[in-house]
Amino acid sequence: MNNFAKISCLAWAVVIIACLPLNAGTSTQEKAFTDKYKAAFEGKDTATLESFLYTQGADPAILGFYKMMQSGEAGEKISTIELVNLTPDDAKKAVTPMDSPTGGKICLTLKPTKKLIIKVEKKDANGSSTSTSESFIAEKDGKFVIPVPGPCK
C-alpha cells in the first residue's frame, strides 16, 4: 500500500469510530425518553406527562386539548411504546398548516424529527380493546418534546 492509501484508510477508520458514539447516544436518549414517558403514563403522573409538551407559542385551547388527551388513558398499561423516524408522508403532514378548532390555521411550533407510537390494550369482563396514539416528537435543547400547535408564522 502506498502512503496515500494508508492515510486514507486511517482517516476513514477515525471518522467511523468517532461517529459510533453519536448513534449510541441517540438510541440511549430515545430509550430514556420512552421509559420515562411510559412510567409517567402508567403511573398517571400528569405533571411529568405535561412536562413533555413544548408549549412556547402554542394555542391555549389546543394546549388544553393536548393535556386532556395525554391524561385520558393515563394509568392504563402500555403494551408497546416506540419512537420511530418520520416517513416522508409524516414529514409532509408535520409541516402542513391545519385548520384550528378556534379558527384560522395552526402549525407545529417545532419541526418534528420522530413520532411516538403508543399502544394500550385493555381487558375486562366485557372483552378487550386496543387503542393506538401517535404524537410528533421534536428535539429542543437536547431533549425530546411533543410540540403543541400554535398560529402559523
What residues fall within each predicted segment?
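A mature extracytoplasmic/lumenal domain signature
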Residues: L53-Q56, E82-T87, K122, S135, ...
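Short beta-strand edge/turn micro-motifs at domain boundaries
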Residues: I117-K153
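Surface-exposed, charged secondary-structure patches
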Residues: Y66-T130
